[in-house]
């Protein structure tokens, strides 16, 4: 490979100009569209926030927005609810998030950390009422849901953020700057892998892969519902089934198609975010996934998904491949790169860039010893939640807003869709359909239990 010939100073100026131009337009849109009750709200004024999902990730998210006023707590588990209420005793308490929206006048913003299959249901009423929303990843449980929620947020002009905290880290932003300024030349392929192997597997495989549960089939026997858990509310729009501890508490539910979407959409929300952002991706042309024979109810522990993306402006077509569990990219298997457990590898005409959450390296290192990267041009932020809170008050754009995050969520779900159908899909993003696979329609949209609708 030849030494990169890019002029960092020129590239930095050009990309900074493009970035600031697009950011200014976006910021103007958000400022003009900010709900009236927050226009001109000072940074020192606190938001009134409703917490939907107070345990697990919800507890962490609550702590991350605790600089504001926590006025509502909601969780299907009374134990989680009461534990959170010890810290926020003045907050109103609910077990059914649908009811809190009946008395929402004092709420400025909502943080949603429920199980994946109820994300859209907890988020949509907030958007329709003009509340700002922070939602855990993945944004929704399905492809059509993701598009619907993203469009609703755009129409309502509310400030949104999906919970992909790595998007706010300096390392991710630096990688995007390096890729966009041509540090390794045009990128024509990228590989993303995570070592987590949770899902359909034997007890022995689960032990080796450090999975907290082993699931091969839906349990036939029921178990007593834990005290304080409102199981029917946890099920929400999902088909009715008796309680068993292979479903709850989280993150056990994420292995089951009725409640989650496996590692592909969970960790894929974090790791696929980096190539999605750096390569300016949106909708793939085709998707083809490989793995063990699909189970009708349980997500796989290991699989891969290959995406073909077309040219984007002056960027060439690119192939992006996802690997999870025991499956790894060829560069890793052949030991041509450092053996990181998780990573993103960009392969360019002039070199490669390997990154994870906290670090990155240009390869081969000998070619980049004297390399000086571009000056930073993507604004740094104090944190993912902090960025959202500030945006709620000022109208500034957020990095993982629902327009961006919705498209990322769609792409991740498409990997699962191709896997479950066992076909290479030709994707029509306008009509949300696979041109060559009409049977995909049943999985692109969703059927909800009686009493639940969007």
Model-predicted segments: where are they?
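Glycine-enriched catalytic-core subsegment of oxygenase/oxidase enzymes
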Residues: 60, 66-67, 74, 78-80, ...
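N-terminal Rossmann-like NAD(P) cofactor-binding module of classical short-chain dehydrogenase/reductase
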Residues: 110-111
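N-terminal Rossmann-like dinucleotide-binding module
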Residues: 23-88, 166-169, 275
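N-terminal secretory signal peptides and thylakoid transit peptides that target proteins
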Residues: 6-27
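Predominantly a Rossmann-like dinucleotide-binding segment in NAD(P)-dependent oxidoreductases
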Residues: 53-57, 61, 161, 166-288, ...
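Short amphipathic alpha-helix with an adjacent loop that forms part of the alpha/beta core around
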Residues: 99-105
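Beta-strand-loop-alpha-helix segment that lines the small-molecule cofactor/substrate pocket
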Residues: 116, 120-168, 175, 182
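Conserved SAM-binding strand-loop segment of SAM-dependent methyltransferases
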Residues: 92-96
């Amino acid at each position: 490979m030849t030494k990169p010939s890019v002029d960092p100073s020129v590239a930095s100026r050009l990309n900074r100009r493009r970035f600031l131009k697009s950011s200014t337009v976006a910021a103007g849109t958000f400022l003009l569209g900010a709900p009236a009750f927050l226009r001109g709200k000072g940074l020192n004024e606190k938001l009134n926030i409703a917490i939907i999902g107070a345990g697990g990730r919800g507890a962490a998210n609550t702590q991350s927005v605790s600089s504001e006023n926590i006025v509502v707590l909601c969780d299907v588990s009374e134990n989680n609810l009461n534990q959170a209420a010890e810290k926020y005793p003045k907050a109103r308490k609910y077990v059914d998030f649908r009811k809190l929206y009946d008395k929402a006048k004092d709420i400025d913003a909502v943080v949603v950390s429920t199980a994946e299959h109820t994300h859209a249901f907890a988020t949509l009423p907030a958007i329709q009422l003009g509340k700002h929303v922070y939602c855990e990843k993945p944004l929704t449980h399905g492809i059509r849901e993701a598009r619907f929620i993203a469009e609703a947020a755009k129409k309502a002009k509310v400030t949104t953020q999906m919970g992909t905290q790595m998007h706010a880290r300096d390392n991710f932003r630096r990688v995007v700057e390096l890729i966009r300024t041509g540090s390794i030349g045009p990128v024509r392929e990228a590989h993303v892998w995570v070592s987590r192997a949770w899902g359909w597997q034997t007890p022995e495989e689960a032990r080796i892969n450090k999975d907290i549960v082993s699931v091969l089939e839906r349990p036939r026997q029921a178990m007593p519902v834990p005290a304080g858990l409102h199981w029917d509310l946890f099920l929400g729009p999902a088909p009715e089934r008796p309680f068993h501890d292979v479903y709850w508490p989280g993150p056990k539910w994420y292995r089951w198609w009725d409640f989650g979407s496996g590692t592909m959409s969970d960790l894929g929300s974090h790791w696929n975010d980096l190539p999605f952002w750096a390569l300016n991706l949106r909708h793939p042309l085709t998707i083809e996934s490989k793995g063990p024979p699909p189970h009708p109810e349980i997500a796989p522990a290991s699989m891969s998904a290959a995406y073909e993306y077309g040219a984007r402006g002056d960027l060439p077509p690119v192939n992006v491949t996802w690997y999870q569990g025991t499956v790894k990219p060829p560069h890793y298997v052949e030991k041509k790169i450092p053996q990181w457990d998780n990573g993103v590898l960009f392969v360019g005409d002039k070199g490669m860039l390997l990154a994870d959450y906290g670090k990155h390296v240009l390869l081969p290192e000998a070619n980049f010893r004297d390399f000086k990267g571009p000056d930073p041009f993507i604004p740094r932020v104090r944190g993912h939640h902090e960025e959202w809170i500030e945006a709620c008050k000022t109208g500034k754009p957020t990095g993982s807003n629902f327009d961006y995050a919705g498209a990322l969520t769609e792409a991740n779900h498409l990997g699962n869709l191709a896997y479950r159908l066992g076909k290479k899909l030709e994707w029509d993003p306008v009509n949300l359909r696979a041109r060559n696979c009409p049977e995909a329609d049943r999985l692109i949209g969703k059927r909800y239990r009686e009493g639940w609708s969007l």
